């Protein structure tokens, strides 16, 4: 099978700040005592056609993994090899709240490299799949979380990505829409596409995924076939639920403390590199956004 995604010793670190002034200081004088691992030393290989589930309690690092896979954030250290174009589906991911659903469809498709002609050809199908009716002409800021998820999912599956990352996007819809999404995911699986599926629903994980990665405290605790991992994870959840509130708080506090670590010079260098990338993006994004809005405006003149 063809290798689609490979993580090698991937970590994502952030610096923690207690107040805004500390963040400003950190731009010039990084604090070595405020390092936090969102994800630490993760390695795995995923092959073409596989559907991989991510499980873990809140704050374990699942969404950070989604953002790394979608190339939204770079790793602090380690290497990520990706043979294909990823697309992230999460509540509100990639949607502009100030624009209407109609404009968001065009904007997101343009950003993914589609032409206006291609967008026009698939527009009606996207709107039909999203099932949000006349709200398609309303600003996204007026949408419920479920409506945002519907629109985001509809756009992403019509763009036809090589690698699909679904982060809790099916947790807010009704059963009918959920069934339709699962059918589309099954179609993608049959086409040999690679899918990453993040969910708190063990039932969804069992139904959809071939293998499961259990993320615990920012680390990859287990990565195996679905049945094996789900069995172990269920036992952990059963144990965790039996803890008192005080015991749960203590457990979470200990886990959080273990993810804080003094930053090495190499770590600080990686963080500085991330900041420089963010500054570059900050300069590029307004220009790109303006260019796309000009295209939208020009297109509107001929509608």
From Swiss-Prot:
Primary location recorded for the protein, binned into one broad class: membrane
PANTHER family, alphabetized: TEICHOIC ACIDS EXPORT ATP-BINDING PROTEIN TAGH
Organism placement in taxonomy: Bacteria, Bacillati, Bacillota, Bacilli, Bacillales
Summary of subunit composition and partner proteins: The complex is composed of two ATP-binding proteins (TagH) and two transmembrane proteins (TagG).
GO cellular component: plasma membrane
Cystines in this chain: none
Membrane topology: Peripheral membrane protein
Keyword flag ATP-binding: yes
Job of this protein: Part of the ABC transporter complex TagGH involved in teichoic acids export. Responsible for energy coupling to the transport system.
Localization, UniProt: Cell membrane
Record-given protein name: Teichoic acids export ATP-binding protein TagH
Keywords carried by this UniProt record: ATP-binding, Cell membrane, Membrane, Nucleotide-binding, Translocase, Transport
Record flagged with keyword Nucleotide-binding: yes
Record-annotated ABC transporter domain positions: 5-242
Catalytic activity: ATP + H2O + teichoic acidSide 1 = ADP + phosphate + teichoic acidSide 2
EC number: 7.5.2.4
GO molecular function: ABC-type teichoic acid transporter activity; ATP binding; ATP hydrolysis activity
CDD domains: ABC_KpsT_Wzt
SUPFAM superfamilies: P-loop containing nucleoside triphosphate hydrolases (SSF52540)
Binding site for ATP: 56-63
Signal peptide: none
Family, similarity comment: Belongs to the ABC transporter superfamily. Teichoic acids exporter (TC 3.A.1.104.1) family.
């Amino acid at each position: 099978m063809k290798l689609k995604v490979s993580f090698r010793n991937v970590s994502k670190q952030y610096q923690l700040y207690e107040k805004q002034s500390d963040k400003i200081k950190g731009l010039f004088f990084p604090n070595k005592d405020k390092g936090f691992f969102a994800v630490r030393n993760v390695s795995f290989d995923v092959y073409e056609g596989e559907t991989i589930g991510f499980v873990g309690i809140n704050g374990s690092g699942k969404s950070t993994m989604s953002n790394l896979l979608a190339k939204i954030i770079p790793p602090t250290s380690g290497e990520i090899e990706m043979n294909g174009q990823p697309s992230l589906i999460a509540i509100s991911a990639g949607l502009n709240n100030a624009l209407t659903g109609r404009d968001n469809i065009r904007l997101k498709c343009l950003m993914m490299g589609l032409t206006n002609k291609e967008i026009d050809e698939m527009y009606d199908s996207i709107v039909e799949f999203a099932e949000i009716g006349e709200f398609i002409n309303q600003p996204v800021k007026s949408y419920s979380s479920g409506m945002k998820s519907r629109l985001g999912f509809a756009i992403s599956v019509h763009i036809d990505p090589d690698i699909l990352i679904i982060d809790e996007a099916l947790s807010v819809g009704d059963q009918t829409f959920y069934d339709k999404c699962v059918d589309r995911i099954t179609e993608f699986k049959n086409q040999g596409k690679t899918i990453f599926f993040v969910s708190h629903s063990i039932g969804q994980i069992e139904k959809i995924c071939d293998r499961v990665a259990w993320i615990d405290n920012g680390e990859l605790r287990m990565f195996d076939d679905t049945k094996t991992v789900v069995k172990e994870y269920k036992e952990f959840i059963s144990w965790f639920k039996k803890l008192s509130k005080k015991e749960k708080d203590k457990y979470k506090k200990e886990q959080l403390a273990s993810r804080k670590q003094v930053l090495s010079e190499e770590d600080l260098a990686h963080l500085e590199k991330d900041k420089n990338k963010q500054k570059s993006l900050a300069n590029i994004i307004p220009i790109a956004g303006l260019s796309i809005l000009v295209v939208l405006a020009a297109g509107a003149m001929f509608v």
